[in-house]
Amino acid sequence: MAKDIKFSEDARRSMLRGVDKLADAVKVTLGPKGRNVVLEKKFGSPLITNDGVTIAKEIELEDAFENMGAKLVAEVASKTNDIAGDGTTTATVLAQAMIREGLKNVTSGANPMVIRKGIEKATQVAVEELSKISKPIEGKDSIAQVAAISSADDEVGKIIAEAMERVGNDGVITIEESKGFSTELEVVEGMQFDRGYASPYMVTDSDKMEAVLDNPYVLITDKKISNIQEVLPVLEQVVQQGKPILIIAEDVEGEALATLVVNKLRGTFNAVAVKAPGFGDRRKAMLEDIAILTGGEVITEDLGLDLKSANITQLGRASKVVVTKENTTIVEGAGESDKIAARVNQIKAQIEETTSDFDKEKLQERLAKLAGGVAVLKVGAATETEMKERKLRIEDALNSTRAAVEEGIVAGGGTALVNVIKAVSSIGAEGDEATGVNIVLRALEEPVRQIAHNAGLEGSVIVERLKKEEAGFGFNAATGEWVNMVEAGIVDPTKVTRSALQHAASVSAMFLTTEAVIADKPEENEGGGGMPDMGGMGGMGGMM
């Protein structure tokens, strides 16, 4: 296929048009008075959202060069979302500001490679300063504030804070659709580990690509199963009971896996195989945890047990198991509560004894899985459209809260980014490197400008006053008042703010150093297709 090539200024200008189209669509959602964006869906009702990354992913432009520019900024939103789970709109606003400001200087003859150095240096200083002004999150109220700011809903803030209190900061929190109008919290005892199904043919819900087993038996072993004969006796006993089975083993492969899949597709019985979590000694400990939770036994040669002679009484039970491509969640295991409590105490004792941070972290993960349970946020709404929008906001709020617990919080509303300007200004840079630093300095003001603009105010006036205010004081766009942001509960997770800045700087630097852009030439359709000429159907006369 023939290619279209653009160079230097022409290339960058074409890509900038794409950047602007995407960023302008995303940035209208920023702040407490940000608007929504409606996304067309080919099937079902349209999606109304204010989630930056969801909007960015939907945008596909006709012009190939513009589309490349748009995709670069979509990458900023996507990467920020992957790492911090929120802050995608802020990241997009920062990236657009850096790219536009940088392009002015490159057009004026500045060296983009030296500008890049300045951008990287300024970003590094800004990130370090953010860490210094970050405050650890304390108590249920602080958690509720972070979630409420992210979701723009105080009620959601309270529910997420309660969920994290009930299952712990490391606990598993899932989001489901509710049948009613209200959003409520349900805490279910259970355990989740990061291993998915051995074959996608095992799924029972093809829309969500997950396998759901109701009241299954759970076979737990540290052996590799490649021959179906090894597990046939116990499988026959399970089939007689008419129940599904979850098989947790070192691996299930070859003939054994094929037999399980074929029987599932034929509807003979429902079995899902997953690999055992962890490695080495940690794997044995986690299998033992699962066995205690489900009331089963680990079938291992270490204890003189053999798969061929395994009995249905050695299998665990659970009220429900959900297996996705990457995770398995066991809900309401049938284990005895006193045995579970004893295991929890044993892990707590190990946490006290261990000196390794890594071991301590892994033990705490195991503890959360055994003792924490699974919190289910059931999202309610009047219509399907509202439901989708609320679900997205709650997902963002949950990610934001987790990020806050991890790295602390800073003043929200773009205030923290303006507060680090002083530190960035003190960088001793010269020439085009200083230009790079100035690009970041100008971009740091942009989120505040945009929040003010979305609230119908002049951004420059707000920014100038904010620079004169003491650190932590900022503008509450929801009420139009100047307040202590942290005391007013207007906070952002440090991790979200940091990730947004780092990813915006990274993509902007790449954009400015682009000198040629290559795209496929659009194909010209000749003749317009359609049916071939039938010659007036005259050739059918001989059939009479």
From Swiss-Prot:
Location(s) in or outside the cell: Cytoplasm
Keyword tRNA processing on entry: no
Keyword Cytoplasm annotated: yes
Keywords, ordered alphabetically: ATP-binding, Chaperone, Cytoplasm, Isomerase, Nucleotide-binding, Stress response
Induction: By heat shock.
GO terms, biological process: protein refolding
SUPFAM superfamilies recorded: GroEL apical domain-like, GroEL equatorial domain-like, GroEL-intermediate domain like
Cited Pfam families: Cpn60_TCP1
PROSITE patterns xref list: CHAPERONINS_CPN60
One cellular-component annotation, GO: cytoplasm
Disulfide pairings: none
Gene3D superfamilies on file: GroEL (3.50.7.10), GroEL-like equatorial domain (1.10.560.10), TCP-1-like chaperonin intermediate domain (3.30.260.10)
EC identifiers of the protein: 5.6.1.7
InterPro entries (UniProt xref): Chaperonin_Cpn60_CS (IPR018370), Cpn60/GroEL (IPR001844), Cpn60/GroEL/TCP-1 (IPR002423), GroEL-like_apical_dom_sf (IPR027409), GROEL-like_equatorial_sf (IPR027413), TCP-1-like_intermed_sf (IPR027410)
Main localization (coarse): cytoplasm
Function: Together with its co-chaperonin GroES, plays an essential role in assisting protein folding. The GroEL-GroES system forms a nano-cage that allows encapsulation of the non-native substrate proteins and provides a physical environment optimized to promote and accelerate protein folding.
UniProt-listed PANTHER family: 60 KDA HEAT SHOCK PROTEIN, MITOCHONDRIAL
The family this protein is said to belong to: Belongs to the chaperonin (HSP60) family.
Quaternary organization: Forms a cylinder of 14 subunits composed of two heptameric rings stacked back-to-back. Interacts with the co-chaperonin GroES.
Official protein name in the record: Chaperonin GroEL
Source species: Halalkalibacterium halodurans (strain ATCC BAA-125 / DSM 18197 / FERM 7344 / JCM 9153 / C-125) (Bacillus halodurans)
Encoding gene, per UniProt annotation: groEL
